[in-house]
Amino acid sequence: MLKRCNFKNQVKYFQSDFEQLIRQHPEKIIILDFYATWCGPCKAIAPLYKELATTHKGIIFCKVDVDEAEDLCSKYDVKMMPTFIFTKNGDAIEALEGCVEDELRQKVLEHVSAQ
């Protein structure tokens, strides 16, 4: 399942699929956080992801439960959790694997400054 982070209202579930989200925002960076509810490192980095989503409104932050979204995991070749895929118009332009807080923060800042 794809969840778009809307931290004012916590998490907003999309009824539509990822392709519709891309069509609605073709020029925006969309960051996909591939996580699992049982994953310790995913839980550890979740507060930072929430902080980044709250701070950087020009980027769309989504969470993808790997146990419910095998199609997206396959599309983006996700092999571990957490994995962060930065996309533009549906194409992966950057990927980070693991609980890499400093790298995640740096990549988000790079993409914000490039907009």
Swiss-Prot record:
GO cellular component terms attached to this protein's record? axon; cytoplasm; dendrite; neuronal cell body; non-motile cilium; nucleus
Q: Which SUPFAM superfamilies match?
A: Thioredoxin-like (SSF52833)
One Gene Ontology molecular-function label: protein-disulfide reductase activity
**Under which name does UniProt file this protein?**
Thioredoxin-1
Q: What tissue expression does the UniProt record report for this protein?
A: Expressed in ASJ and ASI ciliated sensory neurons. Expressed in the intestine (at protein level).
Pfam families, per database record: Thioredoxin (PF00085)
Which keywords, in A-to-Z order, does the entry hold? Disulfide bond, Electron transport, Redox-active center, Transport
- Sum up the protein's function in the record's words: Participates in various redox reactions through the reversible oxidation of its active center dithiol to a disulfide and catalyzes dithiol-disulfide exchange reactions. Shown to facilitate the reduction of insulin disulfide bonds. Might play a role in the reversible nitrosylation of cysteine residues in target proteins, and thereby contributing to the response to intracellular nitric oxide.
- PROSITE patterns given for it? THIOREDOXIN_1 (PS00194), THIOREDOXIN_2 (PS51352)
Q: Where is this site: Contributes to redox potential value?
A: G40, P41
Q: What induces it?
A: Up-regulated in response to dietary restriction and during dauer formation.
Source organism per entry reads: Caenorhabditis elegans
Would you identify the family this protein belongs to, as annotated?
Answer: Belongs to the thioredoxin family.
The active site annotation covers C39, C42
